[in-house]
Amino acid sequence: MTFFEQVRRLRSAATTLPRRLAIAAMGAVLVYGLVGTFGGPATAGAFSRPGLPVEYLQVPSASMGRDIKVQFQGGGPHAVYLLDGLRAQDDYNGWDINTPAFEEYYQSGLSVIMPVGGQSSFYTDWYQPSQSNGQNYTYKWETFLTREMPAWLQANKGVSPTGNAAVGLSMSGGSALILAAYYPQQFPYAASLSGFLNPSEGWWPTLIGLAMNDSGGYNANSMWGPSSDPAWKRNDPMVQIPRLVANNTRIWVYCGNGTPSDLGGDNIPAKFLEGLTLRTNQTFRDTYAADGGRNGVFNFPPNGTHSWPYWNEQLVAMKADIQHVLNGATPPAAPAAPAA
């Protein structure tokens, strides 16, 4: 029996179990997947080739009481914010560790911004420091990304606080859409790659909490409170689709189906996580269209696992679209309409 057949059988069996046992069973599988996919050792060096004009900035954050490291490549007044995954490190952003993103966007007319850190943060403003791992300050990533960093970059690097793109993967896929939903002038463009797009639904709060606890011992209740707290829906892209439609935000949503291609990612955790995530992405697409959304690209190919080569492929694919939206460049040849 294949791993996916075992998972399907487990999910079917879980429907007959008491809720607590069912959550524990599925949670164990999800945490296994997250550990396998994101649990690698710290990387000593980043991918950027020598010669690129990449700067390592220290941007003050009054809300978090510390300076935040930001990797920055200047390229124009409008920027692409590249947000990291669940196991974000404190040395380099995962986009730089795992992809040639700086090189791919060099001389594109766009600046590239990679905030560093934020493990298990969901790039949101938390209620309090994590109560399970001794964190001595409160994550305030939304405040940093929408107020503190834009003001500093405008004053010091000439980057506009408006007209930018937010691109996130996995943990931060939904974060990118939420930033655009609430800050439409700053982010007229948002992309989610293999994101968790309905975090307030069903088992997702519990599963997310288990994953966060595994990734650094973080407590989801310290982030958004119990699952009944309004913060879960406030930060749920599915719930906030009407905002994205009303804003006419340009969105790019990608998710594979768990089948590897020649790009790699042929391992059980990466395949399982992508298959688990696909359903909410498809539901997001359908709900967006039903709510009148007509400014989205939805890519659900017959392959793709929860791994960096697929996300980088999408980052390259969306470059012309981002340039068109942010800089008014020639639009890509293929029309971008909600997929059927």
From Swiss-Prot:
Binding locations of substrate: L86, R87, S170, N198, L276, T277, L278, R279, T283, H306, S307, W308
Protein's recorded name: Diacylglycerol acyltransferase/mycolyltransferase Ag85C
Species annotation: Mycobacterium tuberculosis (strain ATCC 25618 / H37Rv)
Gene transcribed to yield this protein: fbpC
EC identifiers of the protein: 2.3.1.122, 2.3.1.20
Function according to Swiss-Prot or TrEMBL: The antigen 85 proteins (FbpA, FbpB, FbpC) are responsible for the high affinity of mycobacteria to fibronectin, a large adhesive glycoprotein, which facilitates the attachment of M.tuberculosis to murine alveolar macrophages (AMs). They also help to maintain the integrity of the cell wall by catalyzing the transfer of mycolic acids to cell wall arabinogalactan and through the synthesis of alpha,alpha-trehalose dimycolate (TDM, cord factor).
The protein's assembly and partners: Homodimer.
Signal peptide: 1-45
Segments for region (Fibronectin-binding): 102-112
Main location: secreted
Activity-regulation annotation: Inhibited by 6-azido-6-deoxy-alpha,alpha-trehalose (ADT).
Keyword Signal among UniProt keywords: yes
Pfam families (alphabetical): Esterase
